[in-house]
């Protein structure tokens, strides 16, 4: 993708934006396909609250986008950090709350765990799909604020590292 930077109108942020949209589209398609299959197998019903489902999805995308921009900015600045990105990404999968519910945690651990911004979007999606049948814990304003900080910090890191990009 760096070859596109030969063109004057294309900036690094355009490439990152396209990659983020591609990831979001792929994740959305995967979620939709799995949900349709489970719906056809009568394992899930229609979502109870579409607005909460979509809000959680967008909130999760917002926080993830910001975190990805931070990782990208750090990888652009420090070559050794580039090797850690996949390790960090794979570590975040179980921490995100996809494989377990926040309600399963003891209250004192739940409070600490909810400082991680990713589970808030996942819990909102869970609440939108299952409704009152599943207890959920989330604070959308907290995750929105952390996502905003992530995005601003990520954009600053990328803009500051722009001179470190070498087009071969």
Where do the PLM segments sit?
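Transmembrane alpha-helical segments of integral membrane proteins
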Residues: 118-131
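Hydrophobic alpha-helical segments typical of transmembrane helices
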Residues: 1, 70, 108, 124-125
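Helix-loop junctions at the membrane-solvent interface of multi-pass transporters
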Residues: 39-41, 99, 103, 129
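Transmembrane helix segments
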Residues: 76-115, 119
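Short helix-to-coil transition segments within interhelical loops
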Residues: 6-10
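Alpha-helical transmembrane segments and their short interhelical loops
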Residues: 12, 17-85, 135-144, 149-156
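Short cytosolic juxtamembrane segments of multi-pass membrane proteins
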Residues: 159-168
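Extracellular/periplasmic helix-loop-helix junctions in multi-pass membrane proteins
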Residues: 104-111, 130-141
